[in-house]
């Protein structure tokens, strides 16, 4: 898929070489066979990996396999210090003697009314939250060059979900968004 962005207008030309790569080498090919817990980390602006395809890979993992993920916003080929801490906590939870809770990953929903976007962040309340941010980009198909903006926090709704808002510029066809929740135990999830 290198150079072919997930949300491009054009169709992917599937030649024999591309079919072989997807069937045998690409992460999509073996994700369904993974049986161990997974910590999936990626940068949002990598020139080597299409950030938009990360959830495609995770969607191929069996529902019985536990996984969590975290994104490094605006990083290219490196991960941020929060991902490093996630690795430490994940390894300690899997191979150490620490009982570390990994809640389910947060979910973000968006409702549109004209140029106004209302975003709702639903997260696990099994751990205390330190902070949360919602990142958004308008219309940039190539994830490597997206300039991520943060949405304005407007408060919690009656069910405890966090509410954010963003005003789009009006000429955008596509909006890309994700959330990052940092917990007081040092864990960060997207």
Residue spans of the language-model regions?
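Hydrolase active-site cap/lid region
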Residues: 1-14, 69-71, 78-81
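Conserved alpha/beta-hydrolase "acid-adjacent" motif
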Residues: 46-53, 79
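Short, aromatic- and glycine-rich surface loops/edge beta-strands on solvent-exposed regions
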Residues: 172-186
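Surface beta-strand/loop "capping" patches
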Residues: 81-82, 90-136, 149-170
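Active-site nucleophile elbow and catalytic-triad environment of alpha/beta-hydrolase enzymes
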Residues: 14-30
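Short beta-strand/loop motif that positions the catalytic acidic residue
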Residues: 34, 40-42
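Acidic beta-to-alpha connecting loop that harbors the catalytic carboxylate
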Residues: 44-46, 72-73, 139
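Catalytic histidine neighborhood in serine/cysteine hydrolases
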Residues: 58-78
């Amino acid at each position: 898929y290198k150079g072919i962005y997930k949300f491009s207008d054009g169709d992917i030309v599937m030649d024999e070489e591309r079919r072989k790569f997807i069937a045998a080498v690409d992460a999509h090919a073996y994700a369904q066979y993974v049986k161990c817990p997974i910590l999936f980390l990626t940068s949002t602006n990598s020139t080597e990996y299409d950030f938009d395809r990360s959830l495609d890979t995770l969607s191929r993992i069996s529902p019985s396999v536990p996984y969590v993920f975290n994104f490094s916003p605006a990083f290219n080929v490196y991960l941020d210090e929060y991902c490093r801490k996630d690795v430490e906590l994940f390894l300690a939870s899997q191979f150490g003697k620490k009982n570390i809770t990994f809640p389910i990953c947060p979910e973000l929903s968006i409702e549109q009314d004209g140029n106004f976007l209302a975003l709702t962040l639903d997260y696990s309340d099994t751990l205390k939250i330190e902070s949360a941010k919602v990142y958004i980009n308008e219309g940039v198909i190539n994830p490597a060059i997206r300039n991520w903006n943060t949405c304005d926090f407007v408060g919690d709704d009656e069910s405890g979900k966090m509410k954010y808002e963003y005003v789009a510029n009006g000429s955008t066809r596509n909006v890309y968004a994700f959330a990052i929740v940092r917990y007081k135990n040092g864990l960060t999830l997207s």
